[in-house]
Amino acid sequence: MKPPQYRQVPAQVDLPALEHAVLDFWREQKIFAKSLEQSEGRPEWVFYEGPPTANGMPGAHHIEARVFKDVFPRFRTMRGYHVARKAGWDCHGLPVELAVEKELGFSGKQDIEAYGIAEFNAKCRESVTRHTDAFEELTSRMGYWTDLNDPYRTMDPEYIESVWWSLKEIFNKGLLVQDYRVAPWCPQDETGLSDHELAQGYETIVDPSVYVRFPLTSGPLAGRAALLVWTTTPWTLVSNTAVAAHPDVTYVVATNGEEKLVVAEPLVEKALGEGWETTGETFTGAEMERWTYQRPFELVEFPAPAHYVVNAEYVTTEDGTGLVHQSPAFGEDDLKVCREYGLPVVNPVRTNGTFEEDVPLVGGVFFKKADEKLTEDLQNRGLLFKHIPYEHSYPHCWRCHTALLYYAQPSWYIRTTAVKDRLLQENEKTNWFPESVKHGRFGDWLNNNVDWALSRSRFWGTPLPLWTCEEGHLTCVGSRAELSELTGTDQSNLDPHRPFIDAVTFACPQDGCGRTATRVPEVIDAWYDSGSMPFAQWGYPYKNKELFESRYPAQFISEAIDQTRGWFYTLMAVGTLVFDKSSYENVVCLGHILAEDGRKMSKHLGNILQPIPLMDQHGADAVRWFMAAGGSPWAARRVGHGTIQEVVRKTLLTYWNTVAFQALYARTSGWAPSEADPAPADRPVLDRWLLSELHALTDQVTQALESYDTQRAGKLLSAFVDDLSNWYVRRSRRRFWQGDKAALRTLHEVVETVTRLMAPLTPFITERVWQDLVFPVTPGAPESVHLASWPEADLSAIDPELSKQMVLVRRLVELGRATRAESGVKTRQPLSRALVAVAGFETLDRELHAQITEELNVTSLAALSEVGGSLVDTTAKANFRALGKRFGKGVQAVAKAVAGADAAALSLALREGTASVEVDGETVTLAPDEVIITETPREGWSVASDSGATVALDLEITEELRQAGLARDAIRLIQEARKNSGLDVADRIALRWTSTDPEVIAALSEHSELIADEVLATDFAQGEADDTYGEPFTDESLSLTFRLRKA
């Protein structure tokens, strides 16, 4: 029976092609389904998918959250959990309606109503599934495993019934109420917005800032002074109802000799400017209460007396004049104050943002555009004191970007303020990544919580399940079954959307009323839909009761940082309102993805990266790695072809090249893992070091992912892969050529473990490596890396002392390379010796000495102390930057002591740790970074020192060393020729060479056995080659010509 063998691994890899092959493998072998089946019965680890809306095409930013929503479920599955992954679609809401309105060429609600609500909603239903194929393609292509065959949809009747049930629960708690309040209103869409929607749409604009005279008509100043009032919304002056003054603020009369104006005392100079003096007359706001004034416009009628000074605690003296114009139809504080005084609420602006047609001057004008006409009229009538452009942040609709107005009208609210303390308590239990969000962005949001404006005067959404009769009785319905009982007809197949639900009436069931109850016309905020997904995705409580209860709350959710005002908030709010418990325990907030130029991706800038072409150019693994580990996930990051290609070059290709190297030499030598391989304890020190580092890596990566830190996990893995390739493999290359079982077994174990560790981050390339290097040679191995378990770190196998020694070895090698480069002696030229001075060298494992001598290409290695005399002239001076922090003004005295000390003794002491000097009779201890040591090599030596370590190279090159150097030059040339001839690395060759340089002839003759061994030559001889040999290779610097052929 043929022994197991690695599959052949190509040296060059086409990552996108590899990934498409892996996708085929997953699909054909149903690997995702098997991962779910395999983990059935294990502890649940619950993840919720935040539903996207598929009425638009996905962009590169959609990849980001999906990466995190795939990495952690894969990781937890490998850790022994069952992780169900149910996809979902967000179907309702204003964004969908706006897109359909645009398609149909509509300009507002009146067009929709004329077209027909049923027809319009049918178009909405069609639009939200229009691009599901594109989202599913993205999901599949990037390797995001989620169940697309059974997704939840917020528009499905069963989902809506669950939402109704939750609203009835809230209603029964007295927390779903109707109130007349001022709330954000979009005049384009003619609907209200919730506070969390409002937070998503601020834009910087310039508004007119006007100071207006309100002549007093009663009180001690009547007829001889005016109140000076400041506002940035001149259009609201049409419905001015009162002027608010703080009861405890002192207001003064100021004059310029021509008129008198009343302003708050602290604001005289700021509001009036130069040339104004106070008259000495002062009044508190309380004393001014009910002074009447002439209103700025008489364009609308008032049904009751108004236009006098009222007192309000919210008035400040930070800006303006300390007197605040009140228009209760357009301001929350205004409405509250005016209600206390019984003042009327007059609203001349229609729901589309235009003034009523019969309003003089501005009838039919959009509220923002009315400012100019009104300001001009105030100017003409002598009421405008001054007009200054004012730049500020103003709320706009987060979808259509229309300027919002605050609008008083009856709406339905969820009293989230009643559960504010519970929300704060649940937030304390939640783990936020980054942690700063808990008490920062999200905590502030909860602390400033306002009631949730739930109702929307729109069409495509979950209908508000409230029916009311003429007597004002309210009935909240929780299901279609309940509706069937109330109507006495079967409503089980009813489409619960408008307009069908609007036609359902029943006899009011309350107190024997019996009057006809009709549904209120509103739908609900679509954010409530998505916030209900933990239970509504299962149709709870009408089915899947046990399933939901086993999967609530989620252990993990992840979306972009702006969802602190969106889904993160609504999930916590709905969960707390309905179940008295937040819907999640751990949440990863992600920064936004920017274009490579640092700007936001947008169509008009032409900098959008299409996700599928991006992955088909660089590979999904590279994009995933960048999203997960290319910088802090919670900071805004720039993504482009350059950043993705860097991931390919630095990490993925390094990993692949190591795998290809292992496969090549294992196949060449016919090796496969077996019990006959040397045990770890019997392997060379370099192998033992690598295995120790592997177990440390496994422990650290596990901790990082347990802490939701993909950046740290990625950094650890990338650094390890680099060390693996550029230190271990490079230092062990000769052993692999020789088929060394210890080296092959060690690298196999490392590749298998690293492949498992990388699998959640880069599922494609690791799958291919598993199929090529693990599955074929490992009896009982799972058929996919994603069916494998997570590696367990053996902490007892970690050797901190060996790790410390290898750090020292590599540090000395780095110093040796640096001093050789500075000397100009090329690396291939052997030198006789290197001398080392550093703490810990004496205890260094003798095997590690060989690593240093081979790397530095020296014959011997010894401690500098073993050689008599010094190889350098040493000077020492104070590092003022470091010492200044410790000694301040006393640094000069320390510097003088350092300059006067024995520099060589200081250098020696600092290598061991610290040094000391006498300063004004006291001993001062100095650290290595506080003294600058300069060592000038003696002639014939090259010396490099850094932080207490010194490496010296003896530069004397004997004839024997020179010949060895020439031999190494020849080896390099022949190896290049082998590569260019298309030979396999294991192919044996025959070679003939000639040279006109006596030194070269002597060198190649003396070292012929070494050269032949290095270049795999079975026949290496001086002389002319016959026609069976290939084309000649010539190197003029060596006066060397050679020809080779396969042996």
Curated annotation (Swiss-Prot):
UniProt xrefs under Gene3D superfamilies: HUPs (3.40.50.620), Isoleucyl-tRNA Synthetase, Domain 1 (1.10.730.10), Valyl/Leucyl/Isoleucyl-tRNA synthetase, editing domain (3.90.740.10)
Chain residues that bind ATP: 603
GO cellular component, one term: cytoplasm
Keywords on record: Aminoacyl-tRNA synthetase, ATP-binding, Cytoplasm, Ligase, Metal-binding, Nucleotide-binding, Protein biosynthesis, Zinc
Main location: cytoplasm
Motif ('KMSKS' region): 600-604
InterPro entries listed in its UniProt record: aa-tRNA-synth_Ia, Anticodon_Ile_ABEc, Ile-tRNA-ligase, Ile-tRNA-ligase_type2, M/V/L/I-tRNA-synth_anticd-bd, Rossmann-like_a/b/a_fold, tRNAsynth_Ia_anticodon-bd, Val/Leu/Ile-tRNA-synth_edit
GO molecular function (one): tRNA binding
CDD domains: Anticodon_Ia_Ile_ABEc (cd07961), IleRS_core (cd00818)
Domain of life (superkingdom): Bacteria
Compartments, record wording: Cytoplasm
Cofactors named for this entry: Zn(2+)
Main EC class the enzyme belongs to: ligase
UniProt record similarity statement: Belongs to the class-I aminoacyl-tRNA synthetase family. IleS type 2 subfamily.
NCBIfam families per record: ileS
Protein name, UniProt field: Isoleucine--tRNA ligase
Species per Swiss-Prot/TrEMBL record: Streptomyces avermitilis (strain ATCC 31267 / DSM 46492 / JCM 5070 / NBRC 14893 / NCIMB 12804 / NRRL 8165 / MA-4680)
The organism's taxonomic lineage, starting at the top: Bacteria, Bacillati, Actinomycetota, Actinomycetes, Kitasatosporales
Protein encoded by which gene: ileS
